[in-house]
Amino acid sequence: HELRVEEILNERLPGVPVTLSHRLNPSLREYRRTISTAIDASLKPLMDRYIGGLEAAMLDAGFSGKVLVLTSQGTMVNADEIRRAPILALNSGPSMAPIAGNYVAATDSSEADTIVFDTGGTTFDVSLVRAGHVPFTHESWLGRPYQSDLTGFPSVDVKSVGAGGGSIAWVDDGGVLHVGPQSAGSVPGPVCYGAGGTEPTVSDAALVLGYIDPDYFLGGRIRLDLAASRRAIADKVAGPLGLSSEAAALAILDVWTENMVQAISDITVNQGIDPTTASIIGGGGAAGLNAVAIAARMGCPTLLIPEVGAGLSAAGAVVSDVGRGFRRLFVTNSSAFDTAGVRAKLAELRTAAEAFAAQIGAPAEATAIDYFVEARYAHQVWEIDVAIKAEDLEGPNAAEVLRDAFHDAHERIFAFRDEGSIVEAIAWRAQVRCKIAETTELRIASEDTGETAVRNRQAYFAGIGLTEVPVYAFERLSADDVRTGPAIVESRFTSIVVPPAVTFRRSPSGNLIVQPGAANATNSLKS
């Protein structure tokens, strides 16, 4: 029926772009299938003009290569692919953070699983890497969950909450402190920017505590107004709560941290990951303000702050592969397994994946195709993704292979398996990845900032109050020279707060490795 509708539209409205749901998002769930199709169709005219204009401008500038665009599946595709399916570009930026996290973890982490967070000015994005693979979800939203539109399209699982460096601190009528979800944004921005902001933010609190140098923000390009931040916190937070400005600033960071910890707890529980056995990677310009506190609260043994952490998602784009996911519906189960039908669907997926790789000219040795089945126990409502090997489902024991793989995946996520239940397979996916270049390292180009390797300044810490701490220049830390907090590690792009008794060092690959320690999980409001 959809194909016939397309024929009629092409006859009567030639040139008008059409999106067919069975091609874009074959799903049994009508709402998700419909909403993703509507979103994609509405974006096609806009993205066609945008991509066309971009390619024309680059051609005029002398660029003769291919334009690649990021996708929400953690890959890049040719610009023409985005024209055909612009929904691929939704939420593509945050989807790159776990790609960078996976790369960094492979270099400097011994844990199998990794939690990745990216703290910007307005949002806090959390994602995961499980044993080198980035989990997907079908529950991505265009804005706040349940208050915006569900995309219904498979993408990297990223949970976002309104908690960033620009999050506004406020006290409600009952005397309870909140941080966010409102944000000062970049305009007018935090009070300390001096651009008209009047509401105290996380950045203002960090400035009052001495965690940010007012004369070295963005390497000294912006001078911050400490006095204005102090006044705003005193008037809007400290006064109503009966606290000193420093205690109020600490409280702001505590509440901010708890919002983030809750977001991490939600996604790790949903994906069956134990934070106490996972490393955690902090990225984004504001991550360093509470990354150690977050890691300690979650019980993570190791915290990594990449040298490129302030641009974590951009770094992920640098090391991502060209690739795309393909999906086919085919329902079968472990008690009456249709081997021939499954084999046909896997062949379709393989053909589509190989055609994609051929289109970009990727050599076979640089191309990998991963297969997944979306499966569930009989009569359950939701499926989980189960990694499979296509060749294992073509033999006489295909049903047993599917059943055992599902039981293992279900137990890993939910700590439970039901050997006696029938396993239903609903849909089949292939993810093709084409490596276009070997990236040896993610490093920031060296620049003589004129900063000394170690300085000192006053900073406020829970339990000890205002004290003089060393401030280390990130880029000048010697590899594997172990140091202990309290301290601040500073670069042109971020400030990393290291509480007392926490050890840290810089790895040979340039990343900061921190052992948070359980002692730092105490809440500063109790100090």
Predicted regions: what they are:
Residues 4, 8, 16, 92, ...:
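C-terminal, non-catalytic interaction/recognition modules in large multi-subunit enzymes and RNPs
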Residues 109-112, 273-277:
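Short helix-loop-beta connector
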Residues 108-130, 167-171, 292:
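Gly/Thr-rich phosphate-binding beta-strand-loop-beta motif of the actin/hexokinase/Hsp70
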Residues 106-115, 136, 301-306:
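Phosphate-handling active-site elements
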